[in-house]
Amino acid sequence: MEKMIEIKEISPDLVPQKLLLEADPSIERVNQYLEGSLCYVAVIRKEIVGVCVLKLIEKNRIELFNIAVLPENQKSGIGSQLLQFVLDNLREKNFESVELGTGTFGYQLTFYQRFGFRVDSILKDYFINNYDEPIFENGIQLKDMLRFILKL
């Protein structure tokens, strides 16, 4: 039986920080970009299972800072449904582009490219210079950040 997913916009102060920390291990950085952000959540049976946080860069450009799904709900299409909803919503609001930054390896590279995101630039040593603790993914330390952009 397919789960009924409701996707809606909510206030940043209602977003569960634990869920945001699934995608970004720095509570300080999360709190920085959360203030004044645009937040969407995926809800199943009244439980928030996914979140997407964006912030205005300038008039028609927005940055996706965080997209996360609870571990027990991952690989079930929730993240894809959430991102598609957000992108459709941004198009309706006449945004021109969405930007994001992520590590240089991992499943998220394929995930974003399936939606049409293209690599725009590389920020060398970003994760080394901007996080107090090293971040490891699949046993490999994240060092550089890939910047992606999607023209809407």
For every predicted segment, state its role.
Residues S37, L142-R147:
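Short hydrophobic/aromatic beta-strand or adjacent loop that forms the aromatic wall/cage
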